[in-house]
Amino acid sequence: MRTRLNFLLLCIASVLSVIWIGVLLTWNDNNLGGISLNGGKDSAYDDLLSLGSFNDMEVDSYVTNIYDNAPVLGCTDLSYHGLLKVTPKHDLACDLEFIRAQILDIDVYSAIKDLEDKALTVKQKVEKHWFTFYGSSVFLPEHDVHYLVRRVIFSAEGKANSPVTSIIVAQIYDKNWNELNGHFLDILNPNTGKVQHNTFPQVLPIATNFVKGKKFRGAEDPRVVLRKGRFGPDPLVMFNSLTQDNKRRRIFTISPFDQFKTVMYDIKDYEMPRYEKNWVPFFLKDNQEAVHFVYSFNPLRVLKCSLDDGSCDIVFEIPKVDSMSSELRGATPMINLPQAIPMAKDKEIWVSFPRTRIANCGCSRTTYRPMLMLFVREGSNFFVELLSTSLDFGLEVLPYSGNGLPCSADHSVLIPNSIDNWEVVDSNGDDILTLSFSEADKSTSVIHIRGLYNYLSELDGYQGPEAEDEHNFQRILSDLHFDNKTTVNNFIKVQSCALDAAKGYCKEYGLTRGEAERRRRVAEERKKKEKEEEEKKKKKEKEEEEKKRIEEEKKKIEEKERKEKEKEEAERKKLQEMKKKLEEITEKLEKGQRNKEIDPKEKQREEEERKERVRKIAEKQRKEAEKKEAEKKANDKKDLKIRQ
């Protein structure tokens, strides 16, 4: 028995050794950041025809001027015009019914069932309550799949902008972007040496603090970035979420291939705002154990963060420039160039697609669009070398709401999510980049861009007589030219040129896609608002007049009551005086009677006269009292009616 057990253990050890040797032999250092460089069996583009037709896309960019002896340059001097080719978009399918079932099987989310409309079928529940967008992907060459994370939200009201909770779900797609439901990946965990079985779609186990009856819980803005792990590319999913006390929103990463290790990032010796988002991740080639982030573009601030405990140091910062716009809002995770090329020592270059947010431009109140960016490290310094104008890849961007036309809503939103893959596909140096993006917070799609590396390698900048030599791509790669003051000024100029061009783009976009209609709609909304304000003003004036009338009527009633009270008091005094006078007369008569003898008949007559006078006085008082009581009741009734 022991012999058999030893033999079995020996067999297992042999198999693991073969697997390990295979990993070492097949691992390629150039396979980094989601980029496959060999163009062989690990290529994401085995069948180029399956990508569809490529259409021309002209791109204008602005390149920094690195020459101190050049004159002050304008945007035209810094501009670079080139041509890219881009495919139509490919919308990524998502079986929300399948994903819903997975989510509801998890204990923490089981209460969601009670919030769904129970009268609906499952399909109808999905259509009413469940939404998805914001998919970010990377290609895993060793598995021949695209790994994508997307945001799935549940809304009890049936409104995507009013979620109860937000959940991150991982999916895999084949090379042709067909969703693989029920498929799995076996991943060798570098820390435990054990195989981790991952079935897809997969709900990432992120603590959400989901509470029934509360809103806006869960993870948002998922981004996936690749790093070089010990056994191959290792995807890290970055997101923002509320902390356990629900008072702060922070940046996190979760490692799906490392037992879902989750890290929250905190910046040392820095007072972080309550809400954090839009950090842009990237890795240095020689340091895959720490992640770097562009924290912000103005000020340009770069962080270096531990993947173990989340502690971050600010490793580079250029002070905020008040004159420089802050319309750059986040970017796709940055990746290196798709092939190893000679460059200066201790220098590194990344490509990314940041996004702009421009208000009140073109046919929308808010316009979001991608830009192309070249980001450079020289030693411990970082800077932006190139920015393009706004890109829309030839799309008619979905409206945020409205009747389906590009200019039928207040927002026009095209958000770049991630660079899925970038590789050289043939011996001629032709390259293809795949970009995932979202439109109108309601979709996830990919496009393929051809010739971006060639676009960059052919660029040239200022070539005036004062320049020592042209500012071309080879010069960017081979020289170290960072200078704090000059570089800051260059970045300010390049960003200013790019953002001015972006504003020109959105104006043109509006003119060609319904600016007149937008103006008409804005005018109608303005008239409607003015009418509402006028009606509100009239209503207020009417209420003030009514209030004034009631106050005046109240004063009249109070004045009348005062006069009546005074009259009653005067009559009371008069009656008292009459009574007193009568008593005096009676007393006088009685006194006279005692002093003289009076005839009994005369005495009886006088007594009867006295009684008659008393009776008349009493009768008069009674009638006056009844009259006053009747008048008082009538006045009280009238007063009550006025007050009502």
Curated annotation (Swiss-Prot):
GO terms for cellular component: membrane; microtubule cytoskeleton. Residues 512-644 form a coiled coil. Keywords: Cell wall biogenesis/degradation, Coiled coil, Glycoprotein, Glycosyltransferase, Membrane, Signal-anchor, Transferase, Transmembrane, Transmembrane helix. The chain crosses the membrane at residues 7-27. One of its GO terms (biological process) is microtubule cytoskeleton organization. Its EC number is 2.4.1.-. Residues 517-644 are annotated as: Disordered. PANTHER family: MICROTUBULE-ASSOCIATED PROTEIN, RETICULOCYTE-BINDING PROTEIN HOMOLOG 2A. Belongs to the BMT family. This is Beta-mannosyltransferase 2. It comes from Komagataella phaffii (strain GS115 / ATCC 20864).
